[in-house]
Regions:
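Generic structural signal for coil-to-beta-strand starts
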Residues: 63, 72, 113, 170-172, ...
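Conserved beta-strand position repeated across blades of beta-propeller domains
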Residues: 47, 54-57, 103, 164, ...
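Beta-strand-rich domains and repeat architectures in extracellular enzymes and scaffolds
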Residues: 44-71, 287-293
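Beta-propeller domains
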Residues: 65-87
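Surface loop/turn motifs at the tips and blade-to-blade linkers of beta-strand repeat domains
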Residues: 45-51, 86-94, 148-155, 213-217, ...
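Asp-box/WD-like beta-propeller blade repeats and closely related beta-sheet repeat scaffolds
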Residues: 127-164
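Blade-loop segments of beta-propeller domains
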Residues: 82-106
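Beta-propeller domain segments
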Residues: 22-33, 97-99, 107-109, 177-332, ...
Length: 382
């Protein structure tokens, strides 16, 4: 699996002033951008008036659930955003925390279940957790059943939050290091990891360490991952922003079960024994939001590419890999703030209609919030 992952230099490496050699297959991009994209595309507005829409879930009847970071679940019905929330959950919506990822149960058509990752106060501290919900038959309300995974480290920044069901039917949960870099290397911590659990919340069978939910380690703050094939992932991760004197170097990497992506021990394109080197590194901070592999027909030239929403440098980034797993091409679309571009991009996911669906994050306190607030759009061929 290819991943965007930023590696920071280890404290030991800093102390000895040594630097690991660069991995030969890693592409270092000197800026936070890339070549201008050449594929004609068209952007269609689906909904506006949202507040930091973080995740999308497509229902079998064509409706779409949208999470808003302040704690609301909204419904797009018949192409229109309904006013009343489907559900509201109590969250700690400060910094990067709040209501984040959402995923439908693989058996949703039978059980109406979906899952959400969010930050909340518990016993005098903030934690992240994954809770299971059941959607009413009319789709207008939902009830919370129970937490299937709880006490994931939380902080003002680095909360991770993307959740997706894999081709194996297991739930994959991306967590942040909660501003405690060593947690990413601590097998006892669920921080700074990609976790793999059953729909009931137990560590999934076949995990690298029996009885542990940890599938990948060495992550800093991942919001984007998808599958290249049934056993290989592509992951995007945020690089350091001052830890150990390091900054920038957001990454895309390819990984498999048990891999260590290196944070905080290595960073940039460095190769190190027992660590997976990234495929692509941005020298200047991007950083990446959500991302997905595109396999649809609406934009044939993008098929087989990893599309990433870029927050800081405000664009959509396409990454194409060659048969050898190295970056064959990468390019930029929709750069800049509206009306030229879309601004800060958060969720990027292929819809059942074959279009690429994208949410903006211009009202998260780090962008310019327009009068229409944040939007949901679909992207098709031009």
């Amino acid at each position: 699996m290819h991943r965007f992952i930023t590696f920071a230099a280890a404290a030991l490496s800093l102390a000895s002033c040594s630097r690991a050699a660069d991995a030969p297959g890693c592409l270092l991009v000197p800026s936070g951008y890339g070549p201008e994209g050449q594929v004609p595309i068209r952007v269609e507005r689906v909904a506006s008036g949202l507040e930091v829409p973080w995740g999308l879930a497509f229902l079998p009847d064509g409706d779409v659930l949208v999470t808003e970071r302040p704690g609301r679940v909204r419904l797009i019905h018949g192409g229109r955003l309904l006013g009343a929330p489907v559900a509201s959950v109590p969250v700690t919506a400060r910094g990067e925390g709040g209501l984040l990822g959402i995923a439908l149960d693989p058996r949703f058509a039978e059980n109406r279940r979906f899952y959400m990752y969010f930050t909340r106060a518990k016993d005098g501290r903030d934690v992240n957790g994954v809770a299971r919900f059941t959607l009413a038959a009319d789709g207008r309300s939902a009830r919370q059943d129970r937490f299937i995974l709880d006490d994931i480290p939380a902080a003002r920044f680095h909360d991770g939050g993307r959740i997706r069901f894999g081709p194996d039917g297991m739930l994959y949960v991306a967590t942040g290091d909660a501003r405690e870099p060593p947690s990413a290397q601590d097998p006892r911590s669920t921080g700074g990891k990609l976790l793999r659990i059953t729909p009931g919340g137990a560590p999934a069978p076949g995990n690298p360490t029996p009885g542990s939910p940890v599938f990948l380690s060495g992550l800093r703050n991942t919001e984007a991952f998808d599958w290249l094939d049934a056993r290989t992932l592509i992951v995007a991760d945020h690089g350091p922003s001052g830890e150990m004197g390091r900054s920038g170097h957001d990454e895309v990497s390819v990984a498999r079960a048990g891999d260590d992506l290196g944070w905080p021990d290595v960073w940039r394109c460095e190769a190190a024994r027992g660590r997976v080197a990234p495929a692509l590194v941005f020298r200047e901070a991007v950083p990446p939001g959500g991302g997905s592999m595109y396999r649809g027909d609406a934009i044939p030239a993008w098929r087989g590419s990893f599309l990433i929403g870029i927050l800081g440098s405000r664009h959509l980034h396409r990454v194409a890999l060659g048969a050898d797993g190295r970056v064959a091409a990468h390019e930029v679309y929709l750069a800049g703030d509206p009306p030229k571009g879309l601004g800060r991009l958060r969720e990027v996911v292929q819809g059942p209609d074959g279009a690429l669906w994208v949410t903006t994050s211009n009202c998260d306190g780090r962008g310019t919030c327009p009068a229409e607030k944040d939007v949901v759009v679909r992207i098709v061929g031009g």
